[in-house]
A protein has these predicted regions:
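NAD(P)-dependent dehydrogenase/reductase Rossmann-like domain
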Residues: 324-325, 329-350
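Short phosphate-binding/catalytic loops that engage adenosine nucleotides
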Residues: 84-85, 167, 214, 254
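Phosphate-coordination loops involved in phosphoryl transfer and adenosine-cofactor binding
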Residues: 59-62, 144, 190
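Internal alpha-helical scaffold of NAD(P)-dependent oxidoreductase catalytic cores
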Residues: 99-103, 162, 183-276
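NAD(P)+-binding Rossmann beta1-loop-alpha1 motif at the extreme N-terminus of oxidoreductases
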Residues: 2-115
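Rossmann-like NAD(P)(H) cofactor-binding subdomain of soluble oxidoreductases
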Residues: 94, 104, 108-183
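Interdomain hinge/lid region at the active-site interface
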Residues: 272-334
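Hydrophobic Val/Ile/Leu positions in short beta-strands of Rossmann-like dinucleotide-binding domains
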Residues: 64-65, 125, 195
């Protein structure tokens, strides 16, 4: 089984990630084909010929990025620092163009993506998911070019509007949180990147991930919505959970920084336990003990002082009870009894 990883990545971290990915049944060997289509934009007149800026054998492709938001800028900066220069960027926002140019000084900047296509070999669409089909449909690729998007939800078929004979389409989705530029650039090293495309393009995208120090994986066909929903829970969903923790921390006299300082070690320990022992064995708390009174007391307090958090607590408690039942800590009867205790309506004071 073939796998890729960045040459500068610590061996133990890389091997651990690869073992976990392989154990999860994810195919690390991109040997399947993806038919991106061969329709020509001139309706059967044959493939366009790419006019400018072709890379030499062994060199990185000539890259252009459409979109200079958080993802496009961080990816462009990371690739440029890793020795894969960005030739051009396109953004309708002049402030974003100027910022990208300040970070990647040699880049050519365009307000429109159409002239960018004339100058590059690999086009990266780093635009919002809803805009990808429309933007792709406005761009006419040339034979020998490839286009990828950075969406975690959409497949390569979202780029069908840009396809012509002799072109390729794919996707390149980094599992990175793009809240801060420098932190995101650093986070590529050690991240996982989901790639999609035919064999030749997959090889290129795997090398592109490798230079960033990331591990590329190819997902099962049709699995991207579930994969991306999990990513949203791991990032935005987890941040929402931290917000709920901080809200309860305020009731205990802690500010946000104080709550993070108090609960971060427990969060990190739980993640470490899950990685070492598995999710089921990592579960702790009243659900594992069948502690009905504690759950009722928590919900009564939250209903009175933080009702929004009470609803979240109840939903998570139901999930915890399911884990406890699955691992054998609770009988089906005990789990059913505990679920009734986790109903916020039953915990409200009369």
């Amino acid at each position: 089984m073939k796998a890729w990883g960045g040459p500068d990545r610590p061996a133990d971290d890389r091997e651990r990630t690869l073992r976990e990915i392989e154990a999860a049944g994810i195919d690390l060997d991109p040997t399947g084909s993806h038919d991106a289509g061969d329709r020509d934009h001139d309706h059967g007149t044959g493939p366009h010929q790419h006019p400018h800026h072709q890379s030499r054998p062994g060199e990185p492709p000539v890259i252009g990025i459409v979109g200079a938001g958080a993802v496009g800028t961080a990816l462009g900066v990371a690739l440029d620092r890793a020795g894969w220069p960005i030739h051009a960027v396109a953004s309708r926002d002049p402030g974003r163009r100027d910022r990208f140019r300040s970070l990647v000084p040699a880049v050519r900047a365009f307000a429109d993506a159409v002239p960018l296509v004339e100058e590059v070999e690999l086009i990266i669409l780093a635009v919002p998911d809803d805009a990808i089909p429309r933007v792709a449909g406005e761009l006419h690729m040339y034979g020998g070019q490839a286009m990828v998007h950075t969406s975690g939800l959409l497949g390569a078929d979202a780029l069908s509007g840009a396809m012509a004979a002799g072109t390729q389409a794919g996707s390149f989705h980094p599992l990175v949180a793009f809240a801060d530029l420098e932190r995101a650039v650093a986070a590529f090293h050690g991240a996982t990147i989901a790639i999609e495309g035919d064999d030749q393009l997959l090889d290129l995208l795997a090398r592109m991930a490798e230079v960033l120090g990331a591990t590329p994986v190819r997902l099962a066909p049709g699995s991207k919505p579930a994969y991306h929903a999990a990513a949203v829970l791991a990032a935005g969903g987890f941040d929402a959970l931290l917000d709920a923790i901080a809200e309860l921390g305020r009731l205990a006299g802690l500010d946000e920084a104080g709550s993070l300082a108090v609960y971060a070690p427990l969060i990190e320990q739980t993640l470490g336990n899950a990685r070492a022992l598995g999710i089921d064995r990592a579960l702790t708390g009243p659900a594992t003990r069948g502690d009905r009174g504690t759950i009722r007391a928590h919900l009564a307090e939250l209903e009175a002082r933080a009702p929004d958090v009470a609803a979240l607590y109840a939903r998570l408690a139901d999930r915890e009870i399911g884990i406890a039942e699955r691992r054998g800590s609770l009988t089906p009867e005990a789990a059913s009894d505990l679920r009734s205790a986790a109903d916020p309506a039953l915990a409200r004071p009369d």
